[in-house]
């Protein structure tokens, strides 16, 4: 991954790098890989995440329809 430093502004380049890494999910993956996760725990976590995403999507859809 590359980030260009313009006008010797390292702070801005670091912010851009952090944003790219966050978008790619690198920090989340590092956190998950710190400890071994049993397959059953992984399955339960992924199921909970899917439920959370579905609820969020339904909430956004309801809000959008209510606004129109």
UniProtKB/Swiss-Prot annotation:
One of its GO terms (biological process) is translation. The keyword Ribosomal protein applies. One of its GO terms (molecular function) is structural constituent of ribosome. GO terms for cellular component: ribonucleoprotein complex; ribosome. InterPro entries: Ribosomal_bS21 (IPR001911), Ribosomal_bS21_CS (IPR018278), Ribosomal_bS21_sf (IPR038380). Keywords: Ribonucleoprotein, Ribosomal protein. Belongs to the bacterial ribosomal protein bS21 family. This is Small ribosomal subunit protein bS21.
